Amino acid sequence: MDRRILTLAGISAAALGLFMRSDRGAAESTPGKFEITKTDEEWKKQLTPEQYYVLRKHGTERAGTSPLDKIYAPGTYACAGCDLPLFSSTTKFDSRTGWPSFYAPIEKAIGTSVDKSFFTTRTEVHCRRCGGHLGHVFDDGPKPTGLRYCMNGVALKFLPEKKSS
C-alpha cells in the first residue's frame, strides 16, 4: 500500500511539473510580443530539431554536449534563432557545469522572465528580439556581477572575431 501511494505521489508531482512548465511556455509564446515572430512551422523549417526544442519549447540540452562550452576564442555569441549578438567572449568563464556560461550579456540583448517549472523558481533568459529560450541566470557567478548566465549552446552560434589585416 505504501509503495502505491509513493508511486501515485511521484506521478502526480511529475504531471504537475509538466503542467506548470507548459502553462508558462504558452504565455511567453504570445505572437506579437517580440520583433521577430514566426509560426511554429516557420521555426521548424529554420532550426534543427535540437534548436527548436530548446529555443521554442524551452528545453534544455544535456550538460557537456555543446562544443561551445569549451570555446574561449575572441568573438561574439549570437542567438541561433535570429542572429542577435547576445554575449561577448570577454564575459565567458568556465563554470564547470557543462554549459557555456557568461557573467554578463551584451546590453539590451536579452529579456528575462520567471520560470516556476520543476518545483522551483528560476530566472529564465530569452532573446529580446525573437523570444528564443536561451537558458537561466543564477547568482553564483564570478565578479564583477556575481551572475552566471547558464546558456544552452544549441541556442547560440559563435561568431569569431575578425582578424584585422
What are the residue ranges of the model-derived segments?
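Short coil/turn linker and secondary-structure boundary residues
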Residues: 1, 38-39, 47
